């Protein structure tokens, strides 16, 4: 019997009257999968329940932060203790120092770090700092990589490889867009041409070291080192956006996993243990330019707030335990191999990318290595697959171009159930 979403439908109707689009982040509206969203009432471990009582195995994990699973006892107990003392003070606390110390010890390139409240704040602040440090204006980003919703990075490619970017959102002034150059992910040859043309104007390259916002797209062999070499040659900074990959690919993030060191690193998601958080950090000589130590201004009322710091500390302590990342990799591989077999059995052409506990099933015959090949995916097939999986109690990303997240709370039984459901869902997708 198909699940009922009556209460969710009523809530969504009410929400649309008072919240733009009925949601506080666009992907949650489920537009690209052709349905309205269920409203979630609670979660525990690998499961979520909506307001109609439907139960789901959750592979969004709050878009990445819940690497331990929902309501992990260590995080909940730490937060309860913190709440007894207060929520926020607008003053320094030992918790900020503790988490900052943990970050600098974990991430090979980070000598100093500044806490903020979101990944968007982190990347916005890192770009300002890079421009100040280099005394240059232009930024290179990559098509399909998402770094938050601030003006400098809401940019798509222009009509030619070396043209200035143009905004992807109304309200982004063209003079801001003109300082952002959009390149192709995994294309070093194009980057070399860009640097030959305007290298002396480029302040920084910002990149997801493992792309996660066009679906999961790994860096080609030598790509990240090529970025490092180009930045060294032209005195530009290399910024890794590790909001997704930080503490996800390894305890040292993507930079340790791929052994390529950026100048600045942006963080979020996992380091807040499920609470709003962001951070940016890097080499001491660069970070000492941040106010009040230096002239580059950045501030925030709730930056480093006790609750987020507490949840982050508790989460990272769990991730320090032996075997954690091996377990995540094992479970993620078990899921991916099961999905590959289910797709083949259902006669669906699909391409799978997986790195550690991140993966994406693309509905395309092409190997996905950049935005163009990701865009070859059949989004109608994905939508049919998604809806069928949701009906069977499997909660995936409501968009083709997002990651599937595996957590420590997922069990082999969860994965077995997911693979069984996927066979039916792939057959439904094949009819599209």
UniProtKB/Swiss-Prot annotation:
It catalyses: (S)-4-amino-5-oxopentanoate = 5-aminolevulinate. It comes from the Bacteria. GO terms for biological process: protoporphyrinogen IX biosynthetic process. The keyword Cytoplasm applies. SUPFAM superfamilies: PLP-dependent transferases. One of its GO terms (cellular component) is cytoplasm. Pathway: Porphyrin-containing compound metabolism; protoporphyrin-IX biosynthesis; 5-aminolevulinate from L-glutamyl-tRNA(Glu): step 2/2. InterPro entries: 4pyrrol_synth_GluAld_NH2Trfase (IPR004639), Aminotrans_3 (IPR005814), Aminotrans_3_PPA_site (IPR049704), PyrdxlP-dep_Trfase (IPR015424), PyrdxlP-dep_Trfase_major (IPR015421), PyrdxlP-dep_Trfase_small (IPR015422). It is an enzyme of class 5 (isomerase). Its cofactor is pyridoxal 5'-phosphate. One of its GO terms (molecular function) is glutamate-1-semialdehyde 2,1-aminomutase activity. The keyword rRNA processing does not apply. The modification N6-(pyridoxal phosphate)lysine is found at residue 269. Its EC number is 5.4.3.8. It is found in: Cytoplasm. Keywords: Cytoplasm, Isomerase, Porphyrin biosynthesis, Pyridoxal phosphate. CDD domains: OAT_like. Homodimer. Belongs to the class-III pyridoxal-phosphate-dependent aminotransferase family. HemL subfamily. This is Glutamate-1-semialdehyde 2,1-aminomutase.
